[in-house]
Amino acid sequence: MIIAAALCPAAPLLVRELTGVHPVVPDLRAACLAAVAELGAAAPDAIAVVGVADYAATWNAGWALDAAVFAPGAQRHPSPWPPDGKKPAPDLPPALGIGGWLLDQAGRDADRILRSVASDEPADSCANIGAALASARERVALLVMADGSARRTRKAPGYLDDRSVAFDASVQDAIRSGHLDALLSLDASLAHELMATGRPAWQVLAGALRGRKVTSDVRYSDDPFGVAYMVASIRVR
């Protein structure tokens, strides 16, 4: 059963070992760490980290983010990374590695489930993955790593697409209102065109909490560098 959930972006700029001591977007990192800390405070039996990758799979919970995935020699700030007992794994999807990094920074040592969802996963399959995660343990906290559109400005990775604002607003409205089922109706083709890579992960979230009453606190919402990032804490009533 899902007892709490958090939504964070799968953004490499969160990771201190990649950016240095001073956060590139300090408010974003602080919001993510606060959301992850709240997950741990719910005393889960396990924390399931969900992120988008090339294919759906369950990954070794002892694997950690490999900074060299982003650039050889990318670790710019000396630190004891990865933590004891974890192995840097270049095959681990970055979204899951970044999620694990956030958990480690927040000192959350509950058992972990690392679950990727394919970038082209249909909505019903995403929902089924979410339902399976919800039944994995008696008390499961869910950390969803997902980005909105990367076409928010002319300097965005995908340049400006005027449709991106309305699309991202529909996602945020579903999160804020607690009407997560609306995420299952997102247009996958439009999400792809807008480079909103988080679409499948949002739909896993909806499947995991289908039929549950939730309240949400959006801790951060902005589009630095033209990419929509949202951080939210979702509390199950």
List the predicted regions and their residue ranges.
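Conserved active-site and cofactor/substrate-binding residues in soluble primary-metabolism enzymes
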Residues: 23-30, 93, 97, 166, ...
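Cap/lid and interdomain-hinge subdomains that line or gate substrate/regulatory clefts
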Residues: 80-129
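Active-site beta-strand/loop microenvironment that shapes enzyme catalytic pockets
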Residues: 119-170
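Polyanion-binding loop/helix "lid" in catalytic or ligand-binding cores
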Residues: 175-221
